[in-house]
């Protein structure tokens, strides 16, 4: 429950830790579903997730607190009105400072439905990116997915020649014992209430990414809130 970043009558935003799946998979094990009862905060029903985050991606995850709230959030996501910003540390990096990746994506094979590949016949997929800092063969990117395909940011970065650091599927990281996927859902902005300003929520950089994010030039606050100097 300490991971709750925002709460009101309709919505929760939590800081999902890396390594925790959102939904149960065929292998079983611990998932976010096991913790939803602790996030009811007095309501009779458990909240439900309004979108996906990969198991190894950390950061902002939006939940609706009851059926009407979930329907409202689903509508906002369907209309592409929720602004999502990710931070990623990539190997190498783009030559420019900002741009777009417009590459259609499709499942890699029928038996690995959640592994994706670039495919001109696939679903249109668009990512906007901006370089925030660079250091020794690494680049910190701000990524904004305009579409929301499975593994979109990971495949788009890999196909552009700069895979996300710590990615064991699309990058160069080993399956076990790597540095951890350096992809973080940094912020969400949700126009939940028509007559009020959008709700903006930010998740702190996770521990496994702090060293390389700071090396790329970002002045991160220390856990007690002070800057690094």
Regions found by a protein language model. Name each.
Residues 67, 146-147:
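Loop/turn elements at beta-strand to alpha-helix junctions within RNA-recognition modules
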Residues 136-144:
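Short histidine-centered loop motifs in beta-beta connectors
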Residues 73, 149-157:
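Short beta-strand segments enriched for Tyr within beta-sheet-rich domains
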Residues 157-200:
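Phosphate/ribose-recognition catalytic cores of enzymes acting on nucleotide-derived substrates
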């Amino acid at each position: 429950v300490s991971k709750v970043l925002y709460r009101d009558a309709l919505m929760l935003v939590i800081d999902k830790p890396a390594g925790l799946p959102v939904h149960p998979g065929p292998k079983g094990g611990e998932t976010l579903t096991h913790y939803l009862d602790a996030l009811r905060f007095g309501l009779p029903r458990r909240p439900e997730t309004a979108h996906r985050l990969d198991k190894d991606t950390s950061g902002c995850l939006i939940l609706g607190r009851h059926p009407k709230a979930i329907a409202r959030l689903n509508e906002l996501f369907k209309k592409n009105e929720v602004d999502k910003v990710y931070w990623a540390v990539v190997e190498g990096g783009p030559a420019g400072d900002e741009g777009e990746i417009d590459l259609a994506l499709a499942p890699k094979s029928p038996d690995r439905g959640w592994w994706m590949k670039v495919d001109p016949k696939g679903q249109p997929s668009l990512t906007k990116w901006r370089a925030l800092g660079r250091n020794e063969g690494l680049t910190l990117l701000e990524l904004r997915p305009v579409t929301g395909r499975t593994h979109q940011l990971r495949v788009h970065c890999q196909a552009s020649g700069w895979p996300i650091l710590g990615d064991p599927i699309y990058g160069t990281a080993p399956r076990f014992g790597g540095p951890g996927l350096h992809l973080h859902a940094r912020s969400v902005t949700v126009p939940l209430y028509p007559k009020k300003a959008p709700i903006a929520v930010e998740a702190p950089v996770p521990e496994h990414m702090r060293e390389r994010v700071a090396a790329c030039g970002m002045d991160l606050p220390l856990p007690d809130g002070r800057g690094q100097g």
